[in-house]
Amino acid sequence: MTNIRKSHPLIKIVNHSFIDLPTPSNISAWWNFGSLLGFCLIIQIVTGLFLAMHYTSDTMTAFSSVTHICRDVNYGWLIRYMHANGASMFFICLFLHIGRGLYYGSYTYFETWNVGVILLFAVMATAFMGYVLPWGQMSFWGATVITNLLSAIPYIGTTLVEWIWGGFSVDKAPLTRFFAFHFVLPFIIAALAMIHLLFLHETGSNNPSGLISDSDKIPFHPYFSIKDLLGALILLLIFMNLVLFTPDLLGDPDNYIPANPLNTPPHIKPEWYFLFAYAILRSIPNKLGGVLALVFSILILMLFPILHMSKQRSMMFRPLSQCFFWILVADLFTLTWIGGQPVEYPFIAIGQVASILYFTIILIILPSISLLENKLLKW
């Protein structure tokens, strides 16, 4: 009788994905973030489910229902802070996962990469809608500012914004809609993650050298299952430290003030993980131009497979490309810092320089450096 894990229709899918999966023997800790993202998604779905049991999506009671969760529900404060900080951990893992993909040339797996970019958009949409739900000052004004960006679309913009608002301002209708979408999107993300894995397992994982590793593969379990478990424990340690000791570190104090349409906060800004894109948006004086730059700053990831000019896949043996990759990372940190600063000199100028540098490195410098490195290989 054959082993049940290899013959059972359902169990063999799990077996081929997590147990007998042939994995390159030299993948480093940078390959842990895929499983950590799955771990984060599970935490978010479970905590979100319990929060949804007590939350009410009505403008009159949304803020007080969150207060009620924190004060009166058993361990409600823990569930709420795990969910809020879980989003931050999700994005940290996501950015590191994308950074790994860019550095080691994983984007040459075209389908896997494009599904990944769609996943990034879905996660960003979910996080934005979730930020609106507590109905604090930043929730309300963030929703107003971001939804208002759609009015930059020619001809249909204003109609589109009023359609999303269900009226002439952000009120009960968008809050209820955002709650509905915020609830359903994580399940769509889970389905997309499965498609992401399906495409990945068609080709097998990339590895730090960027070379074909068919001749040197080992089973996923126990080698990498243990490695992933260690990664999950380290993530959990950092995560619970954040939740239990400094739960409001990454939040905005303005969100502890109930939403008031008559009182605008001095600095409207999104959560930290959107600040880089927000800085790019603010760097362009024209509204439509800013919106296009904002969208393209994420969509540009889809161009990486086309912009790859090097004969080598990974940046592991390309010191010039490495140099500009890390300049790009530093530039993203700069944009994140600028996004949280007021719109005044010198922050506007720094933001504009950083935005130009971001697009220049990706579209011009990295492909050019790759071509130069190809020449140096012959030399």
Curated annotation (Swiss-Prot):
One of its GO terms (cellular component) is respiratory chain complex III. Binds 2 heme b groups non-covalently. It is found in: Mitochondrion inner membrane. Heme b b562 binds at H83, H182. InterPro entries: Cyt_b/b6_C (IPR005798), Cyt_b/b6_C_sf (IPR036150), Cyt_b/b6_N (IPR005797), Cytb/b6-like_sf (IPR027387), Cytochrome_b (IPR030689), Cytochrome_b_C_euk/bac (IPR048260), Cytochrome_b_N_euk/bac (IPR048259), Di-haem_cyt_TM (IPR016174). GO terms for molecular function: metal ion binding; ubiquinol-cytochrome-c reductase activity. A ubiquinone binds at H201. It comes from the Eukaryota. Keywords: Electron transport, Heme, Iron, Membrane, Metal-binding, Mitochondrion, Mitochondrion inner membrane, Respiratory chain, Transmembrane, Transmembrane helix, Transport, Ubiquinone. Heme b b566 binds at H97, H196. Disulfide bonds: none annotated. Pfam families: Cytochrom_B_C (PF00032), Cytochrome_B (PF00033). Its cofactor is heme b. The chain crosses the membrane at residues 33-53, 77-98, 113-133, 178-198, 226-246, 288-308, 320-340, 347-367. One of its GO terms (biological process) is mitochondrial electron transport, ubiquinol to cytochrome c. The cytochrome bc1 complex contains 11 subunits: 3 respiratory subunits (MT-CYB, CYC1 and UQCRFS1), 2 core proteins (UQCRC1 and UQCRC2) and 6 low-molecular weight proteins (UQCRH/QCR6, UQCRB/QCR7, UQCRQ/QCR8, UQCR10/QCR9, UQCR11/QCR10 and a cleavage product of UQCRFS1). This cytochrome bc1 complex then forms a dimer. Component of the ubiquinol-cytochrome c reductase complex (complex III or cytochrome b-c1 complex) that is part of the mitochondrial respiratory chain. The b-c1 complex mediates electron transfer from ubiquinol to cytochrome c. Contributes to the generation of a proton gradient across the mitochondrial membrane that is then used for ATP synthesis. Belongs to the cytochrome b family. This is Cytochrome b. It comes from Hylopetes alboniger.
